[in-house]
Amino acid sequence: MTKPRYNDVLFDDDDSVPSESVTRKSQRRKATSPGESRESSKDRLLILPSMGESYTEYVDSYLNLELLERGERETPIFLESLTRQLTQKIYELIKTKSLTADTLQQISDKYDGVVAENKLLFLQRQYYVDDEGNVRDGRNNDKIYCEPKHVYDMVMATHLMNKHLRGKTLHSFLFSHFANISHAIIDWVQQFCSKCNKKGKIKPLKEYKRPDMYDKLLPMERIHIEVFEPFNGEAIEGKYSYVLLCRDYRSSFMWLLPLKSTKFKHLIPVVSSLFLTFARVPIFVTSSTLDKDDLYDICEEIASKYGLRIGLGLKSSARFHTGGILCIQYALNSYKKECLADWGKCLRYGPYRFNRRRNKRTKRKPVQVLLSEVPGHNAKFETKRERVIENTYSRNMFKMAGGKGLIYLEDVNTFALANEADNSCNNNGILHNNNIGNDNFEEEVQKQFDLTEKNYIDEYDDLAHDSSEGEFEPNTLTPEEKPPHNVDEDRIESTGVAAPMQGTEEPEKGDQKESDGASQVDQSVEITRPETSYYQTLESPSTKRQKLDQQGNGDQTRDFGTSMEL
């Protein structure tokens, strides 16, 4: 006899059960063939099984039962290889309220002495048992923690009950109810469905490693700067309502500076001091909260005044940017009273803590990655900058007055160059770029650089987790292995005749037909085609500002325009 099913029912996020007023029993779903068409998941309500309900109640006759049983056997082993997942024994200790340092030492040899005390503090701060006996994750919106031994049943049953729902939709639905259902678990479980995995190839059972999206970058090669209000209008020390966050892509090392307002007279000195104190001026700067015109004007002012060469990068990592903002807001608001009274406390609980905690993406501390002693690192960095500038289209380079400073914009050439391996050039020093002339360049950028939900978990989850657990985590990291220095690496010479670098250069005739349909909502830096200039007008921003000054209407302390709303 089959168990009751719930159709056309909305579920509560807290209790994960259907409302009693609309609960009804329905007949078992008829077996569907693999080739039968099904309605879109957006046009139907999804069904959630109860915790502990077996998936076998919903197995159709055409499915490979042996493959399903194999997944049931191997999933507990797979879960033990994941980070931020409770083991079944620890889950039972939390649920029965018998979690102590002694019980932790009894269930595992790795919890001994101080390690057991530290683990106990972390578990007590994050997990608790509600009045109904459910274990909840206090750092993940108080969502229910699915019991480890029922994870496979929960995912597979939901997959089968909802007509083989899979991928991001399945993860989004289950993660809205349970705190521990990750993308890795979804990908692992759904491969044991013979309808979705017709070839029957199963990933080897080994430790799951999350990909490092920026492992090809050098430290300080690419940064992003964001301006936001950490306390929704409340001023730190009664003076600073805003903060400026700067974070390195490769190492996730972050800097935090106070801001009185978002006017140019306050923002430009802060950004200038940041750039001038860097050991290396970054090759590319990006932002998701600053309007692209404002970002250009800020960098233009700094480059012209101090003779720096600054590159403005593609908007390719909005989720990475947002994750850094959210983790800082989370950390500072956890100590809101102290941080509002003392700016030093903001640094202590924000960048000071995160820069010294092990990062799940890089597997090391940000400070270790940033300050790692790599042979020839400085030479590689400067060589890469020169190669990027030499391969940038002349229309995307703007020389400052006097020839001291330079602004260059990332395009198809430099994007490929920044992400290439060390040996991607031939013996003649000519860059092989398969993206030249590619009309779908924006799509290729998203495939290579975008942080999709499938292959990357939000940086906010990493840093928020590290901020609590890492505070009591002993330093067990090993020194970084130093790669051999490539003494044969040469600088690429310019292969073409350089055109005059002027911001007002008119495009070629073939470029005048390019589309001007860029989104007006997204104000971040985004170059969608090689021929597309940073501005869609032929007038450079410096020219526009000079005209405003001549008319007497130029306000150098104006507020910023459209910013991304968090």
Curated annotation (Swiss-Prot):
GO terms for biological process: chromatin organization; chromosome segregation; DNA recombination; maintenance of DNA repeat elements; maintenance of rDNA; negative regulation of DNA replication; positive regulation of DNA recombination; protein localization to nucleolar rDNA repeats. It is found in: Nucleus, Nucleolus. Changing residue 159 to A: Abolishes RFB-binding, replication fork blocking activity and reduces recombination rate. It comes from the Eukaryota. Residues 517-555 have a biased composition (Polar residues). Changing residue 193 to A: Abolishes RFB-binding, replication fork blocking activity and reduces recombination rate. A zinc finger (C2H2-type) spans 159-196. GO terms for cellular component: nucleolus; rDNA heterochromatin. Its main location: nucleus. Keywords: DNA recombination, DNA replication, DNA-binding, Metal-binding, Nucleus, Zinc, Zinc-finger. Residues 479-493, 506-516 have a biased composition (Basic and acidic residues). Residues 1-44, 466-566 are annotated as: Disordered. One of its GO terms (molecular function) is rDNA spacer replication fork barrier binding. Interacts with NSI1. Required for replication fork blocking activity at the replication fork barrier (RFB) site in rDNA and for recombination hot-spot (HOT1) activity, regulating the recombination rate and the number of rDNA copies. Binds directly to two separated sequences in the RFB. Present with 1510 molecules/cell in log phase SD medium. This is DNA replication fork-blocking protein FOB1. It comes from Saccharomyces cerevisiae (strain ATCC 204508 / S288c).
